Amino acid sequence: MDLPGPIHDFLVVLLGSGLILGSMGVLLFNNSIYSAFSLGLVLVSISLFYILANAQFVAAAQLLIYVGAINVLIIFAVMFMKGSEYSKDFNLWTVGNGVTFLVCTSIFVSLMTTIVDTSWYGIIWTTRSNQILEQDLISNSQQIGIYLSTYFFLPFELISIILLAALIGAIAVARQ
């Protein structure tokens, strides 16, 4: 979106805070339904970030696929499960949680130091004239299709396998 600087910055901060609050809700809520709704907030915030970045097709795909299908599937799977058997013997902090926290913190710190230490001067930033020229030559959907079938073929196939495994797992849980 072509917004003035202060409005754009305000929206980025607002969406970022929604993203952080939603992800904290996913981690901290004891009720699985509330965690699933917080995940929906995170996915909607990511979709709105795509809209701010002028990627409306990716935003629509994010909303339809992740919020509309995957998150609803997670909510149905959580509703089919018995919640009482998972709330028994709930320890607030275990050794596995500590190890997971340390691993996630170290990955976060290494990513932040890598981002800060990387010189971003070699990256070519697109200008408005380049975007208009590219839109005249090829449509946005065709460009995404070309990238998915050439440069991002392996990650695209891996994501499809992961989604298939999640769907099979949800069906197996629902059958029990």
Swiss-Prot record:
This is NAD(P)H-quinone oxidoreductase subunit 6, chloroplastic. The chain crosses the membrane at residues 10-30, 33-53, 61-81, 92-112, 152-172. One of its GO terms (cellular component) is chloroplast thylakoid membrane. Its main location: plastid. It is a multi-pass membrane protein. It catalyses: a plastoquinone + NADH + (n+1) H(+)(in) = a plastoquinol + NAD(+) + n H(+)(out); a plastoquinone + NADPH + (n+1) H(+)(in) = a plastoquinol + NADP(+) + n H(+)(out). Pfam families: Oxidored_q3. It comes from Cucumis sativus (Cucumber). It is found in: Plastid, Chloroplast thylakoid membrane. NDH is composed of at least 16 different subunits, 5 of which are encoded in the nucleus. Gene3D superfamilies: NADH-ubiquinone/plastoquinone oxidoreductase chain 6, subunit NuoJ. Keywords: Chloroplast, Membrane, NAD, NADP, Plastid, Plastoquinone, Quinone, Thylakoid, Translocase, Transmembrane, Transmembrane helix, Transport. Belongs to the complex I subunit 6 family. It comes from the Eukaryota.
